Amino acid sequence: MKSKKFKILVLPSDRTGVSKFRSVDPHTYLQKMYPDEFWVDIKYDPPYTDDNWWKQYDLVHYHRSIGPDYDASKVVAKKLKKWGIPQVMDLDDYWLPTPDHPAHMMIKNAKVDQKIKDMLMVSQYVTTTTTEFASEISKLNKNVFIYPNAINHEEKQYIPKPTPSPRLRVGWLGGSSHIKDLEILNGVFGRLHRERAGKFQTVLCG
């Protein structure tokens, strides 16, 4: 008799960015590599109140929250625990950005930081990216594990295309939320230009 497949529900927080590397791709490859053992469903709008729908799964994985409705997500998380269905919460960013972050006040006013902490406390397991963040998370949930982003180095954006140059190239990549990080380099490139003019190239992306 053919054994029953282990059914996993994956609930990404968005359709790009972090969800690709920490929710969608890892589980897509899991099913691809072990098709006889795992079945993975990816859902962006879960039916919070349909108990029978949730009960069909053997494990639920979500990033930050089960869905955009944090209160409903917390209720579902407690039900999953009662039903004996393991749940794994993934979190890669601190729940409250620094005051210079564009989204700081929006998150603070909507109490999203507290809602994320509430989800951490009701989840059975948590996965994250670094030992430093894992240490912080462990103050709220001791069952925390560290996993790197699932990057497929065969995707075209990661395939190196070396371009010969006599210059030393320095690259920096960041978005609008990284302005304060960029300020740390204030004066560095001016000094490099004075001391190494024509010997280096700076590329800013973002």
Language-model-detected regions and their locations in the chain:
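Conserved catalytic-core segment of nucleotide-activated headgroup transferases in glycan assembly
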Residues: D14-Y29, A150-Y158, P162-G206
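Acceptor-binding helix/loop patch of EC 2.4 sugar-transfer enzymes
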Residues: H27, V88-I116, E154, S165-P166
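Donor nucleotide-sugar binding/catalytic pocket of nucleotide-sugar-dependent glycosyltransferases
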Residues: M121-Y158
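Membrane-proximal helix-turn-helix segments that form the acceptor-binding/catalytic region
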Residues: K78-K82, M106-Y125
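A short helix->loop->beta-strand "cap" motif at the edges of active sites that frequently abuts
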Residues: K82-P86, N141-K142
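Structural motif
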Residues: D58-L59, P86, Y125
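N-terminal pre-catalytic "stem/leader" segment of glycosyltransferase-like enzymes
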Residues: M1-G67
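An aromatic- and histidine-rich active-site surface loop
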Residues: H63-K82, L173, L182
